[in-house]
Amino acid sequence: MKKLDQLTFDNRFARLGDAFSTEVLPEPIEQPRLVVASSDAMALLDLDPAEAQREEFAELFAGHKLWGEAEPRAMVYSGHQFGGYTPRLGDGRGLLLGEVVNAAGEHWDLHLKGAGQTPYSRMGDGRAVLRSSIREFLASEHLHALGIPSSRALCVTTSDTPVWREKQERAAMVLRLAPSHVRFGHFEYFYYTRQHEQLKVLGEHVLANHFPQCLTQDEPWLAMFREVLERTAAMIAHWQAYGFCHGVMNTDNMSILGITFDYGPYAFLDDFDANHICNHSDDTGRYSFSNQVPIAHWNLAALAQALTPMIEVEKLRETLELFLPLYQAHYLDLMRKRLGLTSAEDDDEALVQRLLQLMQQGKATDYSLFFRQLGEQAPADALQVVRNDFVDLAGFDAWGRDYLARCEREGQQQDERRARMHAVNPLYILRNYLAQQVIEAAEAGDYGPVRELHAVLSRPFDEQPGMQRYAQRPPEWGKHLEISCSS
């Protein structure tokens, strides 16, 4: 394992030049303190977890120091925000410090969020607050632990530096890791500014470094677009299967690698509500839970438009038509696993949709715990345990009979079924009220709760003695908390 000063950098994106990013030094926050760090994320850089105990660790990730090989850059991009095109966005408070190469030869972007003003700050102060930084850290590591494609978070630092949002808050920084921070909006920026040569350079960079398998295809750019579409379909299927609502699916928040990032007012569903809106700024429900699938398709169409200088329009249209079937196949596969089913039958989609409709009617069923409880006992016994959470008992009993018949046709042993279901159905889920509790403690200077919650959520499928309170249903006050976009 390496020390902080032993990391190896290879800053490929920075070498693209000033058309793609601007050199900016981070603005440090005062008297930095480490709030929480992820040893799992540190391992991606071959970084010794003990390094987090050093004073220099907080200083590095609060903007006070830089590695000699770091080349901090603010990336330029644009994007469609709530359906309207914004011609120039970019990193308004985050900096790509550089790319670290680990022993396996993998490149990891180090992106410091809350690092101060950049040319793209758009009248903002370039800061992030402790509240939003903790939320991003927890979500990044938890989604990864759930098996949902996501950026990673290495640590959060905070300080006494004040920042103003709806009220005065503490400044903080979060260090985000990802193989790339290229977004759909990067391609849109060069397309709409008619910088087609730069568009070509960007695409060749992405192809060579992230989709090299596409280079051997007859049409590498088209193969790359299909790969992006397939990865996005898989990511959205995971969101829907696990009840994750992103909240701000603008094209500048869509990763070219099909990973979840730019966490804002996200939420996991408590009770099932297909129309749940987690962002209180989303007045029309554009980014509601049920809209995430069509919005992902819309965003891919926006990316396709930006690629028209390089790919024939008709071929892009044909590829876009693959999205919904690919999504549905991924989603059904995940839901079969959540229901403990190991084979595919023609009526599986109807079985899943009937269950969700029953959940929607009463909203008394905890979405995550339902699947966990369903695997705890033999199917007939488990159905009796969860039955009282439903309003339409006759409808649930009819569904239960079909589910039992389905399980009997598979003939699984209960021990195997339980182990299989518990491996995909989390006992612990990142609920907004839990995040809010640890945020309030951290704002008061107590970082123990956020560290404990992070540790629990990093093993969401494992029963952890003494941590039962994190597996409980949320109290009524903890449901449907409105989360602001401000961060």
From Swiss-Prot:
Mg(2+) binds at N253, D262. It catalyses: L-seryl-[protein] + ATP = 3-O-(5'-adenylyl)-L-seryl-[protein] + diphosphate; L-threonyl-[protein] + ATP = 3-O-(5'-adenylyl)-L-threonyl-[protein] + diphosphate; L-tyrosyl-[protein] + ATP = O-(5'-adenylyl)-L-tyrosyl-[protein] + diphosphate; L-histidyl-[protein] + UTP = N(tele)-(5'-uridylyl)-L-histidyl-[protein] + diphosphate. ATP binds at G90, G92, R93, K113, D125, G126, R176, R183, D262. The keyword Protease does not apply. Its EC number is 2.7.7.-, 2.7.7.108. Keywords: ATP-binding, Magnesium, Manganese, Metal-binding, Nucleotide-binding, Nucleotidyltransferase, Transferase. One of its GO terms (molecular function) is magnesium ion binding. NCBIfam families: PRK00029.1 (NF000658), PrtAdtaseSelOPseudom (NF045949). PANTHER family: PROTEIN ADENYLYLTRANSFERASE SELO, MITOCHONDRIAL. Nucleotidyltransferase involved in the post-translational modification of proteins. It can catalyze the addition of adenosine monophosphate (AMP) or uridine monophosphate (UMP) to a protein, resulting in modifications known as AMPylation and UMPylation. This is Protein nucleotidyltransferase YdiU. It comes from Ectopseudomonas mendocina (strain ymp) (Pseudomonas mendocina). The lineage of its organism: Bacteria, Pseudomonadati, Pseudomonadota, Gammaproteobacteria, Pseudomonadales.
